[in-house]
Amino acid sequence: MRRSKIVCTLGPAVDTHEMLVAMIEAGMNVARFNFSHGTHAEHQARYDRVRAASKETGRAIGVLADLQGPKIRLETFAEGPVELERGDEFVITTEDVPGDKSICGTTYKGLPGDVSRGDQVLINDGNVELKVLDVEGPRVKTIVIEGGVISDHKGINLPGAAVNVPALSEKDVEDLRFALRMGCDMVALSFVRDAKDVQDVHRVMDEEGRRVPVIAKVEKPQAVQNMEDVVAAFDAVMVARGDLAVEYPLEKVPMVQKRLIELCRRNAKPVIVATQMMESMITNSRPTRAEASDVANAILDGADAVMLSAESSVGAYPVETVKTMSKIVKAAEEELLSKGLQPLVPGKKPRTQGGSVARAACEIADFLGGRGLIAFTQSGDTARRLSRYRATQPIIAFTTDEGTRNQLTLSWGVESHVVPFVSTTDEMVDLVDQEVARLGRFDAGDTVIITAGSPPGVPGTTNMLRVHHLSAQGS
């Protein structure tokens, strides 16, 4: 059993039922819907295909709606792409003008108020660098420091500038409402700056009458500075190394990755490492050695999941990429699991009742040589608390809620299943015997550690731990 999870971005390369079944069988756990591209109709069709493929394979698949976020972009160029050369002057304006080699509009009307003389402006993921010479009304006059080709709708980054854009654009709000109605299991918020950004997402969710976990994409320097508050406020984190490396020193990104992973584990929050993990496999059938090391090190650092972007959405080898990533992940896990139960920060102890029960369950399973950890969970929190200790035993999560089952596809080592509601601990134990026998995971007589809440079915009441020897019931 592979413990770490694989998130795959969907796109034209996998837009058939057969391809999605193959992706799931290859190891996809979470399907990412990138709302920077595609129409709502296209996303709905993909969603329906994912649910059908999940049902056919009998495997839980989480659906992640990734919102575009308030990305600042250029407008359009009248005659196609233009090439800027070092020393050229170039104007970015909030006026509606046809773009050319000397001027182009921007989608962000607040730009002139957010920059000043000497500020750095980056275009196209930092490939083109400009420096602000002056601001005259709606026009920002710049000089080209590093030239290159720019074209319609390329992104603009403003390192160090306090950009006054809302956490959610109008498009994001529309996309979020659609994704919630569609049935997504989790949402990712782009360009998070601080903990307050999650409030805007929750406000829309409450209006729609449906809350799902919100993932903070850490890709702004402000989010790095506020990482402890961001991790505490959000339900999970994505280390979005692409945009982060544009505005934040490239050489410091690996350390940010390690710090975020450690912080998320300490807080029992799932963490995804993303961007260029298997980039060469967009066009090649094998990854580079550096990519293999990157994936393995993310797992050794403690990531819950690794993510594929263009590799799976538009790449030539999407299924092969997932299979290869899965092999690399498994090899890294062998090293990780050989070290035994993973403590959190030395001296760090759980602060909650549920956290204490989870730690005790992992330690007892370790001491007794238990075969598995069984978590009855309504919200998924019990399973996530068990997950952070990276126990050698698989974690089987039983829940009555299909949404919780799908959300747990993001958590390390957790295999989640929907089961009927039980009202007593005796019924709970009987259910364990029946379900484990049905799954064929363990043998009669094997020791498992059960964690649950009493009374059953009430979120946040984890207070029970039981050592159980599986019976032959149901086999």
What are these regions (language model features)?
Residues 1-475:
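Non-catalytic helical/linker scaffolds that mediate oligomerization, partner binding
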